[in-house]
Amino acid sequence: MSTTTTIPGAAPKKKRNRIPLSCTICRKRKVKCDKTRPHCNQCTKTGVAHLCHYMEQNWAQDAKKEISKDNELKNLKERCKILEEKLARYMHNPAVTASLGASVVNSPVGLSSPVDAPIKLTNSPMVKLEDDTNMVDDMARPVKEHDYDELDLTRQFDLLHIKSNGTIHLGATHWLAIMKGDPYLKLLWTHIFTMREKLLEYYTNGSGHKRRKRQKNGGKCPIDHSKFKAAESEQKNHFVKTTPMVNDTPKSSIGKCPIDHRAMSNPVGVNSNAGQFQPMHPPHTHIVQNKCPVDHKVNDSNLTSANTDNKNAATKKCPINHSKYTKEKMQGAGLNDKPLTKQEVIEKLCQLLPPKRIIMLYIDKFFKHFYPVIPILDELNFKNNINQIFDLNSLISNTIMSTSSDLELEPITSMTLNKPTDYSNLGILIIIMRLVWLSLPMNSCKIDIENPLLNKLRTDHDFKNEDYESGSLASSLRLKDELQLLKYEVDGFALDLVKKHLIKFDEISSISNTNVNMSTIQFAVFFKFYLMNCANASSQGNSAGNFDNESHQILLSSIMMMAFSCGLHRDPDNFPQLNVVSANLTTDNTRSGPPSNSNRNGSETPSVSPKDTNVSIERAKHTWRKVWYYIVSLDVQQSLLLGSPRLIRNLNDISDTKLPSASKIDYVKDIKELIIIKNYTLFYQLDLCIVAVLNHTLNISIAKNVRKFELDALISNLQKLTDGEKGINDVINSLINHGLLSTSEVPIGLQKFDDIYDLPRMEDILLARKSEQEIVGDENERIGQDVDKKLDLPHEMTSKALFFSKHMTLRMLLYLLNYILFTHYEPLGAEDPTTTILAKNYAQKALDYALDGYRNCMLYFVGVSDQNPLFKYMNVILCFHSLDIGHRALQFIICLILRVKCGPLNGLKETQTIFGTSVPSSCNSSSVEDENTEEPNNLNQDNQFQDDLMQNINLDNSDSLAEKLMSRMVLFKQLTEKLAPKYSFSVRVMKSTGFFISLLTTPSGSFGSKKNGSKHKHGVGKLLLSNWKHPKISNIPALLSSDSDQLKKCPVYQDALGFMPSRPSVTNLPSISNVEGLLPNAQANGRMTPQLPPIRSYQPITYSSSHMRVTPNSESDARKLGPDSHQVTNPLIPSPLSPANQQQNQVNVLHMHQQRSMSPAPMPMMNPTAMTTNQNMIPERKYAPHSGAATPILPGTNSDIQQQTQMTRNDPYPTEQFSLPPISSAKNNMAWGTTPESEQGDHLTPNTTTSSLDTPDFEDFIIQNSNFNGLLINPNSLAEAMGSLPSGRDGAILNVNSFKDFTTSTNDKTITPNSADQTDLFSVDMASTDFLPIDNFAIDGFMDSANLDIGSIWE
């Protein structure tokens, strides 16, 4: 027998570095692979064909390049053939030929050569897809006829938000753009902004002085006076029994609040020195008091004689909990004082960070459940770096550390921070620990709403509070770890310390890039992700207005510039020197890692084999590619949310970085990373579909004249993708072949994608829980079975949750595209009845996808609450996205409710509605609703039981449409109330939803009372008043005929719609010969150019009131506030006017369009000089208010409409200090047919006394703003939603915190927030956050006109 001898000192035999031929999954499962491409039979049988992956051979790279060139040439030939066929079909279309001939005739230049026309056609998308020809027969003719209609999305949906400190542009995909594109929402928001400004002016002119006084006293008292009063009453009883009659305590101190409110008198948001408005403090930012605000002398004097009793002795303590103030003071001192040294920062961090074992548990939990959401780290490298910083000897191990008590309690005493990358890794670790702690199932928000719709949704999807691993050993270990993590919350102040004092991120991202490296970019991406999803968890106290990504727009641009400076846009294979650097970094990390068994004696440093070095180099390149494509995805996501252009466009022109799937890594030891690269490829393909939509809606060159068939093609492809009828590769190829997606958006070499790893259907994702329960049983039962069939369950479930999010995004785009086409064709029904069919079809599709987004939003939050495994750790990461989808759906629901309740808009000729009703515009819109609203009283109850969230709603069922949609709004309001304590960005959504609910239902103010409600034809629960229209309200829908060039400031009141038919001819206008330059275009075509009425929305109500029955300089004739007053209180009955007043007073310009006749009166032309400019808004206190310019009554208006004067106001504050200067001028008077002499007697002189300046009470304000196209709306609702509802007729304003007592009556039910566990939130966040994301100062300098502390009313 021969023996093999080993020569001492001989080098070990070098192993062959051969690329395996079997797939990764078969080698992992240790089964024989048949090597079938692209997917082997073993993987197909076991159900993991989508994960079958082969490593590429090095020698096959050159051959692959040659094959790819041949394939590319073949694809180009096929594409040219398709384009030629489309061009021939395009030229033979009669409609296209006619439109092309018309465009040539109307063109001022014409076609210079016959070649120009084909070139222009070949550069644009050709025709509609063949798949779209299978439409309904009755829709075939309109589709063919209107295929080449052009839409200008840059004009209809672009929004410029003008703030007091700057401007923000919001594009067509932002959720606010819908209120500008829809005519009903546009007019409603215009009315709301008018009411808002008047309400602000009403507060300014004395009615809010009590509120301002309370605000100057420091807001809410930090003492619970209920307990204090109980102790005081008990103390008085004790005094009666035990103390003598003589009491030296001053009477002024008895019962006095012990808080020294003068110490808290500095108002938030107002600079008392400069008198200018300052940015508001965030909701969670508390002012650090220098001393205790409790007046302890008063407190001691009240309770001195009670020290004999132990119970009363306890009351001598300060009633304020100083612990939180001490903590805030410490944190504030660390950030606001002088810069801290590195050693001081490390000492503070050691106190804030948890023990070593807890840190390791956080990291393991992140890479097991959260890593697929933001996979830009290399797990092995990151753990090595953290081990180097904290000396965690067992961190590199993949197994759970032993639960030894000494290791578990071992705190962090020191940190090793030797290089700048350590700072970034430390910051990433803190963000990871914050995300994991906030996402623990125990921290999820419980949705315990008793609603029939929600209960049925739970029943249909079997959402129960049970774990898919219940009873198993893994479940008990997981629960134990999570309970342990729950005890160690990492303070967000630690992140601020690292970001400001170690990384110095503000300097790096703004002025310097000397310290930018890969770790810095990774930290910046993590920080943006943290701000997007955990804004309320940041110690910096981000306001609730930051949830929609506007505040982080510049942060992403900084990240992108840092990525360009590091060269991430170039593939790392282009730079051979990266191999040496990556090898050195790998060697350093390995040496600094945990000691191995061979190095226990410390004899020598462990050597790194060349194979390990090559693997490390490839992993570094892999991380390079992952970071770059994640930044590209963030750019697409931000563009979709904000409607802003993408920062990285035509990726193929600026970048050659390969997808992470091109990395030469063997994933047999890390199957989780294999899922990551599959997700990267799929998500990038989905981003390409989103890019195709963004190009047609946001790119000015395309969106300016986008054609209907292009949008139809996008809708068809996205619909087939979401329904599972087409794969993602087929959709992308279809978009490219039909010119909807440029090839420059697809990087070179990425045209060949995986055909199997596709987006699953939504039904399969939601049913994944049952399939997983069937596969994954008890731990003991799984022994001996094929446990590798699903490979890694947590990553699989997290990926499916991400698929759910992608489905919501794609379906939101389908809703947006259908909504755009619906709003384009809806108003054209008066001229072309065929467009009504198109409009109704698009409206139905938009409603279906809106309800689908709403339904998925509810499914997500219910699943999080019931701990569905699909969303078990996604309660923070997907919360904002789901809430945004539901909020967008709610906007369209409001659109439809307005159409059902208001009917066709006034001011139009023959209006075709989407509900199949043709109504003459001259008829009152309320009469249409009278037929539909005559329903039995139990209709609502029947629909409540028949309604189902899983079913779509048909627009033809207009009888119950509004009530079904309203029930969904009510449920969404209840949902946001439950989310508000945990997620600050849901506060604004909740207030906006509550505002519209209170606006569209009978308000709880004046019109909701039993006295007035009993006189209404439809009672308290209905929205309309039968055939009643307020005689003094203006005809708001006349704004539809306005021009777009004269409104400059208000983000909704600008760029009025330009799709209306031409106005009546000039011959119908009254004689206005004294107007200079009024008709610049009338002589050319004989028609009146659409012009806008004057902007009077910012004119104070006290200056141009239209329903105030008081004679000037007569306090005796003012409205009496006593019980013996005989004034008419019913707002539906206008008070009669005397003949003298009818002859003396004239109609105000703002209210001259309202009519009682059957046909609308023509509007006068307006010179641009008649517009209110910014100079008119500058306050000048030496002027007094005016009563309004005199205006002649136009033909067709009711002669009973008269201009009234102001009412006497009973408050001690003079009006001169709050007044605005007169906005009328000589040009304005001439433009409206008046002379300066005609209004000299109407204006008040600066010497006018206070008694002659009249202010209306709140009911007059309500009556003046009560009608929107026949729909009764109440300005009380605006005050309710803002949390400052006036009480009674005296104009007293309730406390800001009264919003927590806000109730909404709808469908005979009352919704009341749970104030028991949300008191602090409602008292802080809701009072300081407006329900509108647009601030109150749409015109620069408007705040200066008041110069008062009223900012907290809106902000």
UniProtKB/Swiss-Prot annotation:
Disruption phenotype: Increases susceptibility to multiple azoles, including fluconazole.
InterPro entries: bZIP_sf (IPR046347), Fungal_TF_Env_Response (IPR051430), Transcription_factor_dom_fun (IPR007219), Zn2-C6_fun-type_DNA-bd_sf (IPR036864), Zn2Cys6_DnaBD (IPR001138)
Assigned keywords, A-Z: DNA-binding, Metal-binding, Nucleus, Transcription, Transcription regulation, Zinc
Pfam families per the UniProt record, alphabetical: Fungal_trans, Zn_clus
Polar residues composition-biased segments: 604-614, 1225-1238
DNA-binding annotation, residue ranges on this chain: 23-52
Annotated Low complexity bias: 589-603, 918-927
Subcellular location: Nucleus
Main location as per UniProt: nucleus
One GO molecular-function entry: RNA polymerase II cis-regulatory region sequence-specific DNA binding
GO terms of biological process kind: cellular response to hypoxia; DNA-templated transcription; establishment of protein localization to chromatin; negative regulation of transcription by RNA polymerase II; regulation of cellular respiration
Region Disordered: start-end pairs: 586-614, 918-942, 1221-1253
Function: Transcription factor that contributes to plasma membrane sphingolipid incorporation and membrane permeability, decreasing fluconazole accumulation. Regulates 337 genes under fluconazole stress, including several related to lipid biosynthesis pathways such as RSB1, encoding a sphingoid long-chain base efflux transporter. Associates with the promoter of RSB1 in the region containing two 5'-CCCCTCC-3' motifs and increases its promoter occupancy upon fluconazole stress.
Protein name: Transcription factor MAR1
Species this protein is from: Candida glabrata (strain ATCC 2001 / BCRC 20586 / JCM 3761 / NBRC 0622 / NRRL Y-65 / CBS 138) (Yeast)
Encoding gene, per UniProt annotation: MAR1
